[in-house]
């Protein structure tokens, strides 16, 4: 297993009041005068974890983590009000200004890559470079593959558990059926749907099964925010004007350095999307990890991400 940088604690942390009722948790670790990097977590609704600080050389990087609206330590928990891609882009810009950072490196995987691309295309002059993993651009075909008809061919056993909470008559549109339950008035049904939705992703994220992640994703507090916020974004197509908005917007960031790390056997965000992004952005560096799935903490993915962040140290 490649070695992450040693565990470290934040030297600064706090809450940033954004649009009511939301308050965003943020923290800094590493070198206070170093190269700023912001870790953009997945989901949406996944939140941050202390282990995420460890992809960066703490002697070189000023490491910023934050929990997006409604998840992690941000409040209110699992809140969908005023929770869109463009609200999160605005939150990142407010946080950058709050911390007095001129330009920063964006580091994001899965939904984190979506938000990184959206932010960079909106504020290209505020970005030094991008490190992206498990590319997700929220096109309809990507959602259809994972949540309706595609990944089910590789994980029929896990998929059977995922669809079990939805009556057969509603299975023609599973995202919408889940959304109705996750936003309904029955807290028992909400939680049952949240756990099934979240465990489906946990069971498909690794090349080899990872029981600790399955357990963590099934925990009530995590699952409720993760599933509610994801379904909210997905029924709204990510709040993008067009299906291919992020790929179409690459011209605005083509001049920026970018490393794309992609697991060859990523079932959650298949390599086709990373390939499409790289084709649109020939100056990007695509690193395909031959023995990995989707998760950031698989050995080959860790190695490639560390090489990318070490490569940008100068």
Regions found by a protein language model. Name each.
Residues 2-24, 230:
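N-terminal cap/lid segment of alpha/beta-hydrolase-fold proteins
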Residues 18-76:
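Conserved HGGG/HGGXW glycine-rich cap/lid loop of the alpha/beta-hydrolase fold
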Residues 86-104:
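Conserved acidic catalytic loop of the alpha/beta-hydrolase fold
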Residues 102-141:
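Conserved hydrolase catalytic core segment
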Residues 125-178:
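A catalytic-pocket lid/entrance helix-loop region that shapes and gates access to the active site
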Residues 267-273:
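Conserved alpha/beta-hydrolase "acid-adjacent" motif
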Residues 284-314:
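Catalytic active-site module of serine/aspartate enzymes centered on a nucleophile-bearing elbow/loop
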């Amino acid at each position: 297993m490649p070695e992450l940088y040693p565990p470290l604690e934040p030297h600064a942390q706090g809450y940033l009041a954004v649009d009511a009722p939301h308050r965003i948790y943020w923290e800094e670790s590493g070198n206070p005068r170093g190269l700023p990097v912001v870790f953009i977590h997945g989901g949406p609704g996944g939140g941050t974890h202390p282990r995420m600080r460890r992809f960066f050389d703490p002697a070189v990087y000023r490491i910023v983590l934050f929990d997006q609206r409604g998840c992690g330590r941000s409040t209110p928990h699992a809140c969908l009000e005023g929770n869109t891609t463009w609200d999160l882009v605005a939150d990142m810009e407010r946080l950058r200004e709050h911390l007095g950072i001129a330009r920063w490196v964006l580091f994001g995987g899965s939904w984190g890559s979506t938000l990184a691309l959206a932010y960079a295309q909106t504020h290209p002059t505020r970005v030094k470079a991008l490190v992206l993993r498990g590319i997700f651009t929220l096109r309809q075909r990507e959602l259809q593959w994972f949540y309706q008809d595609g990944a089910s061919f590789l994980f029929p056993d896990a998929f059977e558990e995922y669809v079990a909470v939805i009556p057969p008559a509603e299975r023609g549109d599973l995202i919408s059926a889940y959304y109705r339950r996750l936003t309904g008035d029955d807290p028992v049904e909400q939680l049952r749907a949240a756990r099934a939705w979240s465990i489906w992703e946990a069971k498909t994220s690794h090349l080899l099964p990872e029981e600790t992640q399955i357990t963590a994703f099934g925990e009530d507090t995590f699952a409720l925010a993760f599933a509610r916020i994801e379904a909210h974004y997905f029924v709204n197509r990510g709040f993008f004007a067009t299906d291919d908005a992020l790929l179409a917007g690459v011209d605005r960031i083509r001049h920026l350095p970018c490393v794309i790390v992609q697991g060859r056997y990523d079932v959650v965000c298949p390599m086709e999307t990373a390939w499409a992004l790289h084709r649109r952005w020939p100056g990007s560096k695509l690193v395909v990890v031959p023995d990995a799935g989707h998760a950031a903490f698989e050995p080959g993915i860790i190695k490639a991400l560390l090489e990318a962040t070490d490569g940008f140290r100068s």
